[in-house]
Amino acid sequence: MKKQNPAIRRLALAVLYLAVFAAAVMYLRVTISVPAEGDDKLTLNGWLYDMGRMSFWQYAAQDLQARLRFFLLKEARFFPFHYPNAVALLFYRTLASYRLYIIAVTGAAALLVSRVAARLSRSNAVALGAFGLALAAAPIFNEGMYSYYAVPQRTLFWAAASWLCLFRLYDTRRRAWGVVAAVLAFISCGTYETGYVYALLALLLWVVYTRSVRGGLHAAAPVLGGMAAAFCFHFASGRNGGTGNELSLDIPNVARVTVQQMAASI
């Protein structure tokens, strides 16, 4: 039996990805096309007002100063990458470009998830399925996590990118990949709380992948290090802010609140 040309296979796979993404855009548009409401509408209007009265570079400088406040522990929580940056806000000037931004970020996160699935399964079919499932999860992100500016999608994007760097580190043994993985995990945790969950999932993944607890800890160490650094900032910010972010050891209460939040998301 004659083998299929690899170039044709890659082209066919690309067409399938585009077809799934096109279907996802139609599926997602009901959820992600609505204008921002509530607190998100207020924050977006505030940002756009500042951008309208300043030059781009003035706003970028103001944005950088606001993010530095997180590293100086002057904010109640450590999420310096939570809000869209000055470049991202350029897409928020019209509802059409705003929708395209949300769709693009969602698609980029789903694509990286599919690459992780491809590496784990060594199957393009499984990777394509993971791509579709990640896109299908976007409505849960939007409804349950206030993703008017793609916060959970961006968190997932950085987390999946850090996982891919771990695979490169595992293959090449080049420490530079470990450094990049740690930085990406730090950004993921500094974007939204789910970044911490993804970092712990990375540990679980590598324990299974290496079939060893010690091997999993060693392989996932960069991501865990990035998570630990973000948590130190977050914990220190909570202590200084005094806004209810203190570390709680009331496990039953933590479990109750977690279940309530998950139920609200669904």
Task: Indicate residue ranges for each PLM-predicted region.
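Membrane-lumen/periplasm interface segments of multi-pass, membrane-embedded glycan/lipid transferases
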Residues: 37-47, 52-90, 227-266
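Start-transfer (signal-anchor) and selected internal transmembrane alpha helices
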Residues: 1-27
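Structural signal for the C-terminal ends of transmembrane alpha-helices
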Residues: 28, 118-121, 165-171, 204-213, ...
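Membrane-interface alpha helices of multi-pass inner-membrane proteins
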Residues: 177-192, 202
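Perimembrane helix-loop-helix junctions
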Residues: 197-227, 231
